[in-house]
Amino acid sequence: MEKKLLVVLFLSLCCASRLRGEAAQQWTSATATFYGGSDASGTMGGSCGYGNMYSAGYGTNTTALSSALYGDGASCGACYLVTCDASATRWCKNGTSVTVTATNYCPPNYSESGDAGGWCNPPRRHFDMSQPAWEAIAVYSSGIVPVRYARTPCRRVGGIRFGIAGHDYYELVLVTNVAGSGAVAAAWVKGSGTEWLSMSRNWGENWQSNAYLTGQALSFRVQADDGGVVTAYDVAPANWQFGSTYQSDVNFSY
């Protein structure tokens, strides 16, 4: 009897945990299209600044976001769980979902109406996904489908990377490979001879400092949009070079 009660209690706790997880999953309706070709080669670059998605670690499951989701770059790096809404179209691959990373911006097309080509016009919530990601959930020939989406933790391999471009008194730091929330809300840099200095978002996931940091070992602090903070000490050595990328040994949990 005692063993049966323990089994019942265990199952009850599992169910309660699952229900809490489902309740916490904030599903929102949107639409989705695709671009970039079957190998996603057409998705390289993008307004988040990641460049080559393969070498940046984002692979082919990426998406451009409409203005309503993009937030002037604030959503760069965020991960979304997307599923085709089978209750609203026959073009879904039932029972499937895909996790995509926001890497680009889908601009509005005001010459077209929102339901006839202007998919990314405000206030529409729209995902213009890579073709491989799209075909994980929908039939190729459908063109556009209704979807449901939710933010989901990003899983990354290794630490956060910091690519340094610019010149003296103008450091432009590209922050990539961010796990957890994935989206950076604030960033700081510290030279071995300075205090912590706040950086500002220049564009996408490029963060700007106007300090003179040449010849100093650099540490970085990153705050995600969920409030989490990680600090990467002495990521770049004192002889760091513009045009180089430095990988830390820290990242957010997921």
UniProtKB/Swiss-Prot annotation:
InterPro entries: Expan_Lol_pI, Expansin, Expansin/allergen_DPBB_dom, Expansin_CBD, Expansin_CBD_sf, RlpA-like_DPBB, RlpA-like_sf
Leader sequence residues: 1-21
Main location (coarse class): secreted
GO BP: plant-type cell wall loosening
SUPFAM superfamilies according to UniProt: Barwin-like endoglucanases (SSF50685), PHL pollen allergen (SSF49590)
Cystine residue pairs: C48-C76, C79-C154, C84-C92
Top-level taxonomic group: Eukaryota
Cell compartment(s), UniProt: Secreted, Cell wall; Membrane
Gene Ontology cellular-component annotations: extracellular region; membrane
Domain Expansin-like EG45: residue ranges: 45-159
Tissues with expression: Expressed in roots.
Ranges where the Expansin-like CBD domain occurs: 169-248
Membrane topology: Peripheral membrane protein
Function: May cause loosening and extension of plant cell walls by disrupting non-covalent bonding between cellulose microfibrils and matrix glucans. No enzymatic activity has been found. May be required for rapid internodal elongation in deepwater rice during submergence.
Family: Belongs to the expansin family. Expansin A subfamily.
PANTHER family xrefs: EXPANSIN-A15
Name listed for the protein in its UniProt record: Expansin-A9
Gene name of the encoded protein: EXPA9
